[in-house]
Amino acid sequence: MARQNFLGLVVSQGKMQKTVKVRVETKVFNKKINKELFHRRDYLVHDEGEISREGDLVRIEATRPLSKRKFFAIAEIIRNKGQQFALYESEAQLSVAKEEAQKAKEFLDKRSVRENKLNEKTTLLRDIRTIQDALSSGSTPKELLEIKQRYGIQDFSQETVRQLLQLDISGLEVNLEKQRSLIDRIQTRLSELLSNDLKCDQFLKDHGVEDPLTLKKNIKKNLLRKHVMMDMQQPSQ
């Protein structure tokens, strides 16, 4: 006597040892509407080798009752989509972990640069205060020797303090000028792209935006500004 066979999809695995849940679709004729309908039924199926994965298309075959609800076993894996997905999932997890590690490294590098710049400014202000204290008290602490070497100063006076303050202000002015120049270049580039739809769409495509023609005007402008800013800031990183 031929054994009963079904084709089904593995919808659950790993919850019970050597057992998977397989969903089988069969056509059932409905007399009320005089039409065939798909009927779904889930079977608990024995998987001796525990090789089937969720998403696999399998052929199940009737066997002796293995438990109260389990009387089918995996006979053949027709299509191992579940195993392919499991492999893809593990590779995706590794890829995401690498990407997160790279982003974390970039963040820490940027923070380190900011902290170094802040430390330089703090050191300058601390040195100015040390010089002022030394001038008011008439003493020459050991720190003054280090300050001389750091800035190439021969003698300490109020003029020295003014020069160091000017050095700090000059640094701020340079940074401010750089920011202004960057903003001007971004605005110029943005205006250039917005005035030419072909250039604008090609620019977005080159930066990974799919089908920019279908985007709303405000969304397109925001994406354009984002990628222009990233391009302009890239050389300075």
Curated annotation (Swiss-Prot):
Subunit structure: Component of the mitochondrial small ribosomal subunit (mt-SSU). Mature yeast 74S mitochondrial ribosomes consist of a small (37S) and a large (54S) subunit. The 37S small subunit contains a 15S ribosomal RNA (15S mt-rRNA) and 34 different proteins. The 54S large subunit contains a 21S rRNA (21S mt-rRNA) and 46 different proteins.
Organism encoding this protein: Saccharomyces cerevisiae (strain ATCC 204508 / S288c)
Taxonomy, superkingdom: Eukaryota
Any one GO MF annotation of this record: structural constituent of ribosome
Task of the protein: Component of the mitochondrial ribosome (mitoribosome), a dedicated translation machinery responsible for the synthesis of mitochondrial genome-encoded proteins, including at least some of the essential transmembrane subunits of the mitochondrial respiratory chain. The mitoribosomes are attached to the mitochondrial inner membrane and translation products are cotranslationally integrated into the membrane. uS17m may have a meiosis-specific role as it accumulates during the middle stage of sporulation.
A cellular-component GO term for this protein: mitochondrial small ribosomal subunit
Protein's UniProt name: Small ribosomal subunit protein uS17m
Any further remark recorded for this protein: Present with 2810 molecules/cell in log phase SD medium.
Organism ancestry: Eukaryota, Fungi, Dikarya, Ascomycota, Saccharomycotina
Cysteine disulfide partners in this protein: none
